[in-house]
Amino acid sequence: MNLPASIPVRTFISGCHILHRHHVLDAYGHLSVRNPERSDTFFMSRDLAPGLISSSVDLVEYFVHDASPVNPASPAGYIERFIHSEIYQKYPEVQSVVHSHASTVLPYTITGVNLRPCVHMSGFLGASVPNFDVAKFYKEDDKCDLLIRNKDLGAHLAECFSAPESDSESTRSVVLMRGHGFTAVGGSIPESVYRAIYTVENAKIQTVSMTLSAAAAKGDGPHSGIYFLPEHEIRGTKELTQRSVMRSWKLWVREVETGGLYTNLA
């Protein structure tokens, strides 16, 4: 695919590689970016493991309104591209989307335990992260396999990104998906990648903290539970990470460029 210079192909490919290197994506999951030249289309890779994407040939352009390929002769794409199209349709400020099946986050989608920000790098999670259950929206002819296979299911998922009226932001950064994974959004590829990575990191930290807290509760020493970020620290740390995301991004790009596994010909 011959793309205009304004399309961030190299950044997109680096983002896919970074997400794979950090175990946010494996053979499955995907990254997308809105077309900076026309907001009614977006780009994803063809049906390929993220770590193997290497050039613009691997990209497919889709219409936002129905997730159909702009070029009908495009190679096969991901089934769940409706996750991305419906988020772009509803939230014009969103420029990039990540969908992940990370195993460290999955327990928070099936246990009733809320994923909450507990470190300064994850204030973007907000006071609580909603958990979307696709089973509530199946129609009679839908495949009941948890995948977002059509526009209707994608639209229901997208609704979960609408923040409460009390929130200063109009869009949530992350939504969990019951038994499936999570989806993160951002105003750029680096921001959505950062949020996906630190969603996984926060889940790791919270899980270990809950284990230690449970052990402490059984002992003789003092026990005060887990200290999650209060509202004012959530706001402050979210602003902090929005300003500093490129520091992480530049390091991550260098790591995948020198890692040996990945190829970026863009």
UniProtKB/Swiss-Prot annotation:
Cofactor: binding comment: Binds 1 zinc ion per subunit.
Group of enzyme by EC: oxidoreductase
SMART domains the UniProt entry points to: Aldolase_II
Pfam families named in the record: Aldolase_II (PF00596)
Cofactor: Zn(2+)
Gene Ontology MF annotations: actin filament binding; metal ion binding; oxidoreductase activity
Signal peptide region: none
GO cellular component terms, semicolon-separated: cytoskeleton
Catalytic site: 80 (proton acceptor)
Keywords: Metal-binding, Oxidoreductase, Zinc
Binding site for Zn(2+): 80, 99, 101, 180
Pathway connected to this protein: Secondary metabolite biosynthesis
Record keyword Signal present: no
EC number(s) stated in the UniProt entry for this protein: 1.-.-.-
Task of the protein: Decarboxylase; part of the gene cluster that mediates the biosynthesis of the tropolone class of fungal maleic anhydrides. The pathway begins with the synthesis of 3-methylorcinaldehyde by the non-reducing polyketide synthase (PKS) tropA. 3-methylorcinaldehyde is the substrate for the FAD-dependent monooxygenase tropB to yield a dearomatized hydroxycyclohexadione. The 2-oxoglutarate-dependent dioxygenase tropC then performs the oxidative ring expansion to provide the first tropolone metabolite stipitaldehyde.
Family: Belongs to the aldolase class II family.
Protein's recorded name: Decarboxylase tropJ
Organism: Talaromyces stipitatus (strain ATCC 10500 / CBS 375.48 / QM 6759 / NRRL 1006)
